[in-house]
Amino acid sequence: MVTRLGRIEGLFGRRLDELDYRAIAELVGSSDAAEGEDLDYKQAHYRPDDRGREELAKDIAAFANHMGGLLIIGMAENNGVPSKVLDVDLDDARLRHIRQVIVSNTAPPVPYEPIAVHNPAAPGTGFLLLVVPRSPAGPHAVTAPASRPSKDTLRYPRRGGSRTEWLTETDVATAYRARFAAAAEREQRPRRH
């Protein structure tokens, strides 16, 4: 089951698991489809080095720590507006690598759903959608080694508009309190038999 992201589904006029290549390609030039707190574009796959792993973990955790969101890989943007289709490889090795990076470089691991949307004119290429729900298990930390000097071992990102912000210690404490309160509330609900 694919996560429901209301604003983005409204943009396409359909559920994310029903998207085809053409619907995504038609976003080019649409200011309604500009990057925001629930939408981000990458023109290519993340690099396979430490910096790429850190960036992928940060982008995914930022969505999970905020309101959820959609990352579209294979679309360039100009000032946040989708500007050009740049198909990416959709092979199993790429999908396994992304899964391994997210599981190994976020704590707790961020749940997400990959959707490969193939270009009918170029089999094996197209868009890779990473659908990230808002996570009840947050806050999620990035555990990948920092590519820039940082005093923090665990870094907690979240979306702030079309950018990534970093949670302060107070924000992290508040997020943990909310997680534990929600878990306690679920535990107190009457069980159906």
Label every model-predicted segment.
Residues 1-193:
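Conserved N-terminal catalytic/coupling substructures associated with nucleotide/phosphate chemistry
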